[in-house]
Regions:
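Polybasic, lysine-rich low-complexity intrinsically disordered segments
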Residues: 4-5
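Gly/Gly-Pro- and Ser/Thr-rich, intrinsically disordered tail segments characteristic of DNA damage-repair
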Residues: 9-246, 250-253, 375-388
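Structured loops at beta-to-helix junctions and adjacent beta-edge loops in soluble globular domains
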Residues: 64-66, 142, 279, 322, ...
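DNA-contacting surface of Y-family translesion DNA polymerases
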Residues: 24-25, 212, 220-364, 372-387
Length: 388
């Protein structure tokens, strides 16, 4: 796929019915691009490249992570999910559900490579791109591609090209803001394109169960149900004073999302000289320290890979968590020397984490390194924490 796939001439020649000399609707359009079961998909791609004859995406399979002799499911295939095997589940429990479970170890170096390949491909066509995590990003379609009438066609062409070129599938959500685009990408999977425009909220989003609203956690669901809030429509039409009494200050955020309101910009984070970071929701509210620090371990490896790629080192480490009431807490520490290896980043991250966390439930954890400088990269125990 060359750049002609995303040019005015290409669409006028091959899709004349979608092009108009009056231009496109000036309503803002955002794409959310999300790799389907990313770690599982990338492990499947890796073993296929190594000669394995079976695509584990089509089998009951998981990628697992070990932390202090506890094994957790890091990612599950679609067939595994249908059997009730979920992210964060104890691996032994997953094996009880399906004794023939195929298990694959994580390879974060390879995952980072796959992520970089995707972002590099997308940047050829979308100058304004915000990488949201290792496996998802937002692009500002309206600003960057002003001559196209039908974003669905563009998204479908892009989705198919990613599958052909990179050997893994993505969902692409299209909406009038980042929130709607992200909600759309979570509709039916895998390898799909979905829209959720403002005029489609009533039909596509409001009938959904309240826990399917991005930003609304299952922990909230029982209390909301007691108040008669079972669907997103119920939340969108509740009295604001009533919501404040139930949700506190977070009511405004959820109410705005339930009504499809989101004014946040797609912020290009291409310039990594200022700092690099990684964060992830834990999928569940948890106070399991071993499970939480397994994320920090993974992030340390991701950061080493990014630093190595850019030949950078840094001396400020930052760790942050999000509590179940959606308040954030962070700690950072400035070192007297530069570091760039996973083992050192992880070492300081653990110290910071234990300072800021006191056993309470959290649902997001993040790790960053900043004050970066160009330096010779020293490889000490690269990936040894995870892969050996």
């Amino acid at each position: 796929m060359s750049k002609k796939y995303l040019t005015k001439d290409f669409f006028f020649l091959y899709y004349p019915w979608i092009y108009t000399t009056n231009g496109y609707s000036m309503e803002r359009i955002v794409f959310h691009i999300d790799v389907n079961s990313a770690f599982l998909s990338w492990s499947a791609k890796q073993v296929l490249e190594q000669g394995y004859k079976v695509d584990i995406r089509e089998r009951v399979s998981v990628v697992w992570v070990e932390e202090k002799r506890k094994c957790f499911v890091l990612a599950a295939s679609m067939p595994a999910k249908k059997l009730g095997i979920k992210t964060a589940m104890n691996l032994y429990r997953a094996k009880e559900l399906y004794p023939g479970l195929i298990i694959a170890p994580p390879d974060y170096k390879y995952y980072k490579q796959c992520s970089n390949e995707l972002i590099k491909l997308l940047r050829k066509y979308f100058p304004t791109l915000q990488q949201y995590s290792i496996d998802e990003c937002f692009v500002e379609y309206t600003e960057d591609i002003r001559d196209y009438w039908d974003p669905i066609t563009v998204a479908t062409e892009l989705k198919d090209f990613i599958k052909k070129k990179l050997w893994f599938t993505v969902n692409i959500g299209i909406g009038n803001n980042k929130f709607l685009a992200k909600m759309a990408s979570d509709f039916e999977k895998p390898n799909k394109v979905h829209t959720l425009y403002k005029n489609e909220i009533k039909e596509k989003m409001w009938p959904l169960a309240i826990w399917e609203l991005f930003g609304c956690w299952r922990r909230m669901e029982p209390e909301l149900r007691k108040m008669g809030i079972q669907t997103i429509w119920d939340l969108a039409h509740k009295n604001k004073q009533f919501l404040w009494s139930v949700l506190g200050n977070y009511w405004k955020v959820l109410w705005e999302l339930a009504n499809g309101e989101d004014n946040t910009k797609v912020i290009d984070n291409y310039d990594e000289r200022k700092g690099m970071g990684a964060s992830s929701i834990t999928r569940i509210d948890t106070h399991d320290r071993d499970f939480i620090i397994s994320f920090l371990e993974r992030f340390a490896v991701e950061l080493e890979l990014g630093l190595m790629d850019k030949e950078l080192s840094g001396n400020v480490i930052n760790v942050w968590v999000r509590h179940t009431d959606f308040t954030y807490k962070s700690h950072q520490h400035r070192l007297s020397h530069l570091i760039n290896t996973a083992d050192k980043i992880y070492e300081y991250a653990l110290l910071l984490f234990d300072e800021l966390w006191h056993g309470e439930d959290i649902n997001l954890v993040g790790l960053g390194i900043s004050w970066l400088k160009k330096t010779e990269f020293k490889q000490n125990t690269l990936f040894s924490l995870i892969t050996h």
